[in-house]
């Protein structure tokens, strides 16, 4: 079964969201996917977020583990910890869910977080995945542009039964893939969910179609891709590393 595109009743998380958090140290954004079984998988440019949620009497309760996936020495994270268990409670306000919470690993830091649904109804249908296809999971994705372009990007990507959902601090990814015998290929649409302020000017403001192909094993995958951004055609290489298995 592919990734569900149907949202449940108001007050219960389901599907793809962007999140924005505000703390005493600053703000940040990313993406989060909520499964029908109460699991959460997401992340941003530097960290992944994996956890679970429940809902009772209009209150959504979450426990999420934040783990660093990007360790480039030039990258300065907002929080110095490698891992932190975070707890939140939230309520629905229209389509959004507003959370408050924090972590004992980050004393004195209070998180005010808003989840806003992302429309993925126009995503391509799931691709065919063979019995030895790439494993379902949450992966980190590290991108490096080719052809002399000195640029790159990092984020997270959830692969599940031929469907792709993911993103980073500024962009969301929706797509599909097929995989068998150590080879995979697919398509992704890269969309800006939060203004990128020039962080990725090539993709900023565009809905970018991307086709890719490559190889995979039990630990991750890699591939080369071509992105069509406006009138430009841009090639890049992507490396995926499996972070966790996923559950419904």
List the predicted regions and their residue ranges.
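Short beta-strand segments that buttress and anchor functional surface loops
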Residues: 19-21, 40-43, 64, 99-104, ...
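Edge beta-strand at a domain terminus
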Residues: 2-5, 55-56, 96-129, 179-180, ...
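An anionic, turn-rich surface loop/hairpin at beta-sheet edges
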Residues: 65-88, 188-213
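Short, tandemly repeated low-complexity microdomains enriched for cysteine and small residues
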Residues: 28-32, 74-78, 101, 113, ...
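Short, solvent-exposed coil/turn segments at beta-strand boundaries
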Residues: 12-16, 32-40, 56-59, 90-97, ...
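Tryptophan-anchored aromatic micro-motifs
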Residues: 2-26, 101, 124-149
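Beta-strand elements of well-folded, non-transmembrane domains
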Residues: 23-25, 66-70, 92-94, 105-107, ...
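N-terminal glycine/threonine-rich, aromatic-flanked beta-hairpin/loop signature
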Residues: 25-70, 148-185, 189-191, 231
């Amino acid at each position: 079964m592919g990734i569900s595109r149907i949202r449940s009743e108001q007050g219960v998380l389901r599907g793809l969201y962007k999140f924005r958090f505000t703390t005493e140290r600053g703000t940040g954004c990313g993406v989060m996917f909520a499964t029908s079984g109460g699991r959460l998988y997401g992340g941003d440019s530097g960290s992944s977020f994996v956890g679970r949620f429940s809902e009772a009497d209009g209150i959504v309760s979450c426990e999420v583990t934040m783990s660093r996936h990007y360790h480039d020495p030039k990258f300065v994270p907002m929080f110095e910890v490698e891992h932190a268990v975070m707890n939140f409670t939230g309520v629905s306000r229209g389509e959004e869910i507003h959370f408050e919470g924090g972590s004992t690993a980050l004393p004195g830091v209070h998180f005010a977080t808003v989840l806003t649904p992302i429309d993925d109804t126009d995503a391509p249908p799931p691709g065919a995945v063979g019995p030895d296809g790439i494993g379902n999971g949450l992966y980190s994705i590290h991108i490096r542009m080719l052809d002399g372009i000195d640029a790159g990007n990092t984020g997270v990507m959830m692969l599940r039964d031929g469907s792709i959902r993911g993103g980073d601090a500024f962009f969301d990814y929706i797509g599909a893939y097929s995989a068998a015998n150590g080879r995979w290929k697919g398509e992704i649409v890269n969309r800006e969910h939060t203004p990128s302020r020039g962080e990725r000017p090539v993709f900023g403001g565009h809905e970018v179609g991307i086709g890719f192909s490559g190889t995979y094993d039990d630990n991750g995958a890699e591939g080369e891709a071509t992105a069509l951004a406006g009138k430009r055609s841009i090639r890049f290489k992507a490396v995926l590393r499996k972070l966790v298995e996923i559950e419904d």
